[in-house]
């Protein structure tokens, strides 16, 4: 369901790949012997997810869905990016479905939080708070705000039915709070890190409340697991990892993920965390960036075309079938001179822009373009691409000889912030 097309890189990957190394790393992955192997639980998750808990989540989600208009998903990083990526990719940006998902706990902006409070005052809403520890600053202080808003609105007894916590099975501040107050809880597995957790209750529960078919998401992930099993470049995930690593070793610094669909913008944000937090260690790693074309062709396109060379390459998501399409209307006066486009649909024009940009950037601009060919934007495709990118990332990180599953660098800013805020115990 995803094909890696390297025709626009001017590279014969079979001549540059160290296939023995790929095979060696493949064995490290499947045998769980590489760095950070305690966090490879996602590898077999499409088979091994807790079916009993999944059915419980469906029941709770259906009840919640019948009572609310809005679900406030409170989390940061991997605790919300995957869910939001799925929601926007599958339902689009202006869907008319019964339950709206909105997001908090991913910022400390007072203006954003205030406006969200005002928006919710006249809405029937529930809360899904997501945190392994329950002590992460952004979701912690946001949950205080929205929990109070909900309790003040409906009372404590009713609020118990409208708040769900996704957290550790046995310990942590959020687990302790939820048990004390009687909130329903579901489990974040110990062997799956946050940025790999979208197919766990972290992403699946709020998506169930939204009405998205999560069975199809699991089907897509399982299909990827069953297809991406080879230890050579017929494995499309490994093919993507190898070409990225080759370009990195040639001196390229940035991999820009390009989408021509606005509803994939949050997918690119999820991808940036997945690759950036996993690879950016020991002074190594490509900088993951993203652009939305054709929008950014009118702002960053000049830099892409004529800026410094051998700094950035592009990974382009090409969608074969849009969720919807429409034609360009005829205008009798034709003042804009665009009637020649009325023979084409918007998707055909968008695809033509994609082809034109690839030619401009890869041929004229001499910038490698990797094309990821997706069939469509639906629930099954989302499950597939999650597994594809997680496997590609793991191979890519091991090719760099870094641990894909830790993130020690993010603790530095937290320490400085806590010290400035006079947090007890911080010197």
From Swiss-Prot:
SUPFAM superfamilies: SIS domain. Keywords: Cytoplasm, Gluconeogenesis, Glycolysis, Isomerase. One of its GO terms (cellular component) is cytosol. Pfam families: PGI. GO terms for molecular function: carbohydrate derivative binding; glucose-6-phosphate isomerase activity; monosaccharide binding. Its main location: cytoplasm. PROSITE patterns: P_GLUCOSE_ISOMERASE_1, P_GLUCOSE_ISOMERASE_2, P_GLUCOSE_ISOMERASE_3. Its EC number is 5.3.1.9. It comes from Mycoplasma mycoides subsp. mycoides SC (strain CCUG 32753 / NCTC 10114 / PG1). It is an enzyme of class 5 (isomerase). Pathway: Carbohydrate biosynthesis; gluconeogenesis; Carbohydrate degradation; glycolysis; D-glyceraldehyde 3-phosphate and glycerone phosphate from D-glucose: step 2/4. It catalyses: alpha-D-glucose 6-phosphate = beta-D-fructose 6-phosphate. The active site is at 277 (proton donor), 298, 414. GO terms for biological process: gluconeogenesis; glucose 6-phosphate metabolic process; glycolytic process. It is found in: Cytoplasm. Belongs to the GPI family. It comes from the Bacteria. Catalyzes the reversible isomerization of glucose-6-phosphate to fructose-6-phosphate. This is Glucose-6-phosphate isomerase. NCBIfam families: PRK14097.1.
